Amino acid sequence: MELSSVSSFSLGTNPFISIPHNNNNLKVSSYCCKSKSRVINSTNSKHCSPNNNNNTSNKTTHLLGLYGQSRCLLKPLSFISCNDQRGNSIRASAQIEDRPPESGNLSALTNVKDFVSVCWEYVRPYTAKGVIICSSCLFGRELLENPNLFSRPLIFRALLGMLAILGSCFYTAGINQIFDMDIDRINKPDLPLVSGRISVESAWLLTLSPAIIGFILILKLNSGPLLTSLYCLAILSGTIYSVPPFRWKKNPITAFLCILMIHAGLNFSVYYASRAALGLAFAWSPSFSFITAFITFMTLTLASSKDLSDINGDRKFGVETFATKLGAKNITLLGTGLLLLNYVAAISTAIIWPKAFKSNIMLLSHAILAFSLIFQARELDRTNYTPEACKSFYEFIWILFSAEYVVYLFI
């Protein structure tokens, strides 16, 4: 809406308000629909004709748009009437929230979308994306090396296997939030559970259901005792990490061991299952040996950086982490340094064994990832390590985690 001297708005109250014309500014609060701040010179409006400032009698001024006919949520609007010598201008500012008309079907669809969005946020999207990319790239590499073994049923089995792995991932993320509610009210008050967007009962359902479904899928796929054991190990690791009386997360060493078991188990199980599905025997290829070593050392950075944004809550509830002991800045420098050493080792590997890897891809990709890490660490330092910036930095480490598996496809 643009305020002007002529308006077709219908008014819910008396449209004429008596305003004293003196040397004082007058603020009249009203309601209006959305408009950016506008300044209307009253000399161009028939409703605010200029008068001599010596005239101190009350004039009747027609204020427009007190109650406009619009489908919107109404927000306060301020009118400021200036004195005549200053041009009798009116400054209006307004904010609204759209409220479009919704049919029953549209409203139900919106509710479903909102629920799915909250569920997706609850299972920590950055970890889920990392697991999906990891699984896809490990399986994709085997297909690239053995294209003659491709078949549609094989892809279907691979998708079911990925869903099983995601089940353990969702369980680990969910069980941690359920038992960290008090801490998260301080560290992450915007999470779906502590913010009240989902109930505790719903959280338990979203946590246990994926784990059970994943276990059923593992059995249905006839994955064998090894993969079934690895799945159970992932569930066990997520449990002892978060659930009392274990709460391994309260000690930085045991927390690292849990995270290492989860990531190492994921890496090995997907590779083993991929080769088994293709009818190939398990073998430690140079590329898989490299990605296993790289991800193992990268887990050090993930484990040390995961609590950067949680320092305040962890200290209050007596949770000892590397971040609470050493501080956000020192942990960032430590984690960044370890990961940079990892990239240097990757570049050195490409130089030392040029026949085992595609050296050009190894060199260029890891150099780019290393410089991007340095840039993000500098950006974090400039923010003085605020919780929001620390959270973004940790999620960026997960992006680097995923990027390494993409590189693995082509080395």
From Swiss-Prot:
Note accompanying the cofactor annotation: Cannot be substituted by Mn(2+) or Zn(2+).
Function noted in UniProt: Involved in the biosynthesis of prenylated phenolics natural products which contribute to the bitter taste of beer and display broad biological activities. Catalyzes the first prenylation step in the beta-bitter acid pathway. Abble to transfer dimethylallyl diphosphate (DMAPP) or geranyl diphosphate (GPP) to phlorisovalerophenone (PIVP), phlorisobutrylphenone (PIMP) and naringenin chalcone. Can also use phlorisobutyrophenone (PIBP) and phlormethylbutanophenone (PMBP) as substrates, but not 6'-O-methylated chalcone or naringenin.
One Pfam entry name: UbiA
Location within or outside the cell: Plastid; Plastid, Chloroplast membrane
pH-activity dependence text: Optimum pH is 7.0.
EC top class, as a word: transferase
Enzyme Commission number, as recorded: 2.5.1.136
Primary site of residence: plastid
Official protein name in the record: 2-acylphloroglucinol 4-prenyltransferase, chloroplastic
Matching CDD domains: PT_UbiA_HPT1
Pathway the protein acts in: Secondary metabolite biosynthesis
UniProt KW Iron-sulfur keyword: no
Reaction equations catalysed: a 2-acylphloroglucinol + dimethylallyl diphosphate = a 2-acyl-4-prenylphloroglucinol + diphosphate
Keyword Transmembrane set for record: yes
Alphabetized GO MF terms: prenyltransferase activity
Tissue: Expressed in glandular trichomes called lupulin glands, and in early stage and mature cones. Detected in leaves, but not in root, stem and first stage of flowers. No expression in male flowers.
UniProt keyword list: Chloroplast, Membrane, Plastid, Transferase, Transit peptide, Transmembrane, Transmembrane helix
Family (UniProt): Belongs to the UbiA prenyltransferase family.
Recorded GO CC terms: chloroplast membrane
Parts of the chain that traverse the membrane: 159-179, 198-218, 226-246, 253-273, 278-298, 333-353, 356-376, 391-411
Membrane topology qualifier: Multi-pass membrane protein
Known cofactor(s): Mg(2+)
